Each structure stands twice: as C-alpha cells, then as structure tokens.
C-alpha cells in the first residue's frame, strides 16, 4: 500500500515544495514517474494549462519523468492507454478544480482502477483542493452545496480545503 498526500489549494505556488519533495523521495526519487491528473480542471477547459503547471512544478523540484494524463471525461477515464500510464506511475497527483466532476468522472472507471492498482503496489496518491476532497469517504460540493460520496481512500473523513 502506498501513501496518501492531501494538500490545500494553490498546489504549485511554492508552498508545497517540502511535502512534494518528500513524496518524490518516497516514490523513488527524481526518476519516479509522476502522473498529473487535471480532470477537475476540465469543465472550464483549463486542464491543459493545469496539467502543464503540474509538469513545470515537479520539474522545478528536479523530477525527470512528469506527464499529464488527459482524463477529462467518462470516455477518456476508460481509455486503456491512459489507464496504463496511471498503473505504472509512482505518484498520481489529482489537481484542483470542480470536485463533483472529478469524483464522478473517476468513480468506477478504468483509470481509477489502474490508480488503485498502482496504490496497492506502493504508489503515492496525492490530491490538492478538489483532488484532496474526493479521496475522502465524503466531500462537499460547493457548487451543489451538498455532501457527496467520495472515492473512500480516507474513511470517515471529509476534507474542506
């Protein structure tokens, strides 16, 4: 079983360098494969920018193998090629954005199953803002103003970054 890393917002603004460096160390160092999941940024068409921000951030910390996995809807969440990228990653980082969209897109998908396989083999699952929220048993959707069922990696918890 791997580690979970739950971070607040502004994930690539410089304040998360210490926990991100520690995650890289636990994942095998600067050579670890780091997969950025910009799913939560897809509804407002910011997933490319968000994914690129994640790539630049981890490269600035010294990571050599960082890539964005464009899981942006139900179809791509079930793409076997994208699932393989997640299955082989040592860090899978869920970005912030729209929590409900992220949770509903990943839940029950091939990509989420692949992420869980990687986690079972020791990969780190990290989430910032919406990404941290959906990893819990419950999360609050600020747009719908209600509590929803999360991906349940953190039981009996609800993170509100």
Segments the model singles out, each with a brief description of its role:
Residues 95, 101-161:
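Class I SAM-dependent methyltransferase SAM-binding "motif I" and its flanking Rossmann-like core
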Residues 1-91, 95:
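N-terminal beta1-alpha1 cap of cysteine-dependent amidohydrolase-like domains
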